[in-house]
Amino acid sequence: MFLYALRRLLLAIPLLIGITFISFLVIHLAPGTPGEIQTGDLSIQSDKEIQKLLIELYDLDKPLHVQYWKWLTRIVRLDFGKSFSPDARPVLQKIGERLPITLLLNVVEMLIIVALAVPIGVYSATRQYSMFDKVTTVFVFVGFATPDFWLALLLMILFGVQLGWLPISGLRSLNWEYLSFWRQQWDFAGHLLLPILVATFGGLAGFSRYMRQSMLEVVRQDYIQSARAKGLPERVVIGKHALRNAMLPIVTVLGLSLPGLIGGSIIVESIFAIPGMGQLMVQAVFERDYPVIMGNLVIVSTLTLVANLLADVTYSFVDPRIRVGARRGRR
């Protein structure tokens, strides 16, 4: 297992380099430069000399492969550079301020999705074509078809504007500093409720469908029929024998879902004005802040590769056949 994990880590290094290289080229080939953005986007009032100085300052006059090599040598030393924005703050500092919020949103979202999708999928599979199964099927189609931004706007209008129950932007109220400790926590949770609800809606629809399909495949297996023929209670058959095997594909899906969750957080954070990685990424793209964009991509790509590795390792732990196959392969 250790050698397998080490091999996967070594294979992830060239993959990460390839991701960053392609992203670096695409970003720099996009129209507009940081100098043009900061001086007015080539308007009549723009100072050409200032743009030239900014290009030289940022080494943007060098060939792309030279720029990428210089950036890569800094990344190896964990030096993400400084932002091109007027504050010129270190990229790691800006990311460090935003990353915890994005991780909190995604972790809570994933926990809610798993906690709800597993029982929904199991109940739908064990009662196939029942009214509950039909209702959840409609919910799945609605969840897949509903854009996050459209759902976010509807919930903001309903709960924030018309009913006034929940805040619709930011993480804290204006009077947050004057609230008691527990009121501050309640205020913070209230600001996160709508974003988490929006982010969870589509994922819950997909995961419940995956769980249902996986459970249907398992309950049709011979060993499940044998367990029922032995007179075991249905609760034991489903909970002890079927559920564990039905969860195996879900482990892989969870690892592969991380990029989509982070990508979805870009939309949610932008709409709800949440100061997370997604909002930072959008601002950096509009400002052509190359160091911040690449820093975000490195962090997100690394998290994705690590999540996929953890999913594979977890899969081997819950499925003994993987470990046996790996031992036979070494022989």
Walk through the language-model features, giving the residues of each.
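Hydrophobic alpha-helical transmembrane segments
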Residues: 44-61, 137-146, 194-199, 236-253
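Hydrophobic alpha-helical segments of integral membrane proteins
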Residues: 9, 50, 54, 64-80, ...
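Alpha-helical transmembrane segments of integral membrane proteins
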Residues: 2-3, 95, 99-132, 161, ...
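N-terminal signal-anchor/signal peptide hydrophobic helix marking the start
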Residues: 6-15
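Membrane-water interface segments at the C-terminal ends of transmembrane alpha-helices
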Residues: 22-29, 58, 73, 139-169, ...
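An internal, D/E-rich "acidic patch" concept
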Residues: 60-118
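Residue-level signal for discrete positions within transmembrane alpha-helices
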Residues: 12, 98, 102, 138-145, ...
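Hydrophobic alpha-helical transmembrane segments of membrane transport/permease proteins
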Residues: 16-69, 163-184
